[in-house]
Structure formats: C-alpha cells, structure tokens
C-alpha cells in the first residue's frame, strides 16, 4: 500500500512556508527606503513614475537593479580617476602653452576630446545608475561628492567652448584667463570629489 504525500498536507504547507519566509522577509529589505531624499535626477529616471519606469527599461527585480548599480558605480570610479589624470595632463599642457610653447596645441586639442569623452562616460554611469537601497537627509561625504559633481560637470561642459572662445575673442588675455579659471575650478572640484569617495562616512 503506497503512502501519498497529500496525507501530510499540513506538513507540506509548513515546508512551503519555511521556504518562502526568507524570500518574503528579504523583499522589503530590498525596497528603496526614504525615497523622498532621492536625488532629483534619480527620481526623474528611476522614481515610481520615472522615465525608465515608464519605458519598462532595466532589470526586472530590485536585486538585479542593485547588482547593476554596483557595477556601474565601480566603472564610474575607475573612469573618473582616469579622467582626473587626463585633466591634470591637459592643465599641464595648457600652462606650457600659456608660457609660449604653442607646439603643444595639437596635443592639447586631441587630449581635450579624449578627456571630455572619458569624463562624460564616467558621469553617465553615475547619473544613470539605478537607485540605492537607502537614502537619508544627513550630511555625508557622498552627498558632498554629489554636490561637487554638479560643479565639475558644469565646468566640463563649459571648458571646450571657452577654449574655442580664446581664438575668436577680441580680448585674448581675458578669454584665456576665464578658460584657465574655469578649468582650475573644475580640476579642484574633481580632485576633492575623488578624495571624498575614500572617506568612511
């Protein structure tokens, strides 16, 4: 005489509950906490009614979103350091040109494109990354890092146009000074932003 597992339906249900309980408990932990403190650009892209949500674009689960976020931010950090190094080299070329070595003009122009492209790729990885697991309103190194990103992003957008303006401007010295000042502020904000990523708070 065979024994059917249905005779032990209470046991079967108990096993199901034990199996599902960790999954049920883990789900709320993966939900975005304190959404009201989410950065504006993240809300616009990944909020409940964000652009990517409307397109049904991206990973299907929060767990996969968080994995993608980690990968994107890791690559963002690597490219950001490369961008910082390239910008330092660009600044060096610029100061040498200011001293009269115009033989570096071609290198300065070529590396400006490489630097700009690397920076924008790095910035895109950060701005387009899925939301974090938790947000808060306290001051932290990462929040200052984000504020500084607005400064050096604006600088990187402006520097190429200010460089071209040197050639066409009626006041060469003034145009050159403006270009260098914006480039210096951009480099300083990027450097400080990079340092903040290594702080534990």
Predicted features along the sequence, with ranges:
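Predominantly the C-terminal beta-signal and adjacent terminal strand-loop region
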Residues: 166-186
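Short, charged, amphipathic alpha-helical segments
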Residues: 104-117, 142, 175-182
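Sec-dependent signal peptide recognition
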Residues: 9-17
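Membrane-active amphipathic alpha-helices enriched in small hydrophobic residues
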Residues: 78-92, 113-128, 147-162, 182-198
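N-terminal targeting leaders of membrane proteins
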Residues: 20-110, 121-139, 201
């Amino acid at each position: 005489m065979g024994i059917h597992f249905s005779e032990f339906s209470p046991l079967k249900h108990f096993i199901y509950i034990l199996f599902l309980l960790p999954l049920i408990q883990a789900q709320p932990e993966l939900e975005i906490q304190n959404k009201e403190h989410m950065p504006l650009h993240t809300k616009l892209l990944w909020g409940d009614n964000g652009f990517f949500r409307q397109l049904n674009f991206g990973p299907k689960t929060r767990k996969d979103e968080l994995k993608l976020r980690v990968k994107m931010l890791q690559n963002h950090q690597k490219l950001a350091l490369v961008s910082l190094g390239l910008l330092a080299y660009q600044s060096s070329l610029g100061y040498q040109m200011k001293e009269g070595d115009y033989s570096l003009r071609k290198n300065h122009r070529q590396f400006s494109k490489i630097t700009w492209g690397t920076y924008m790729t790095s910035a895109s990885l950060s701005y387009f990354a899925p939301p974090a697991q938790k947000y808060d309103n306290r001051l932290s190194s990462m929040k200052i890092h984000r504020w500084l990103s607005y400064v050096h992003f604006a600088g990187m957008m402006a520097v190429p146009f200010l460089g071209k303006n040197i050639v066409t401007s009626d006041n060469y010295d003034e145009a050159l000074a403006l270009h260098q000042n914006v480039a210096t502020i951009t480099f300083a904000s990027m450097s400080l932003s990079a340092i903040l990523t290594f702080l534990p708070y």
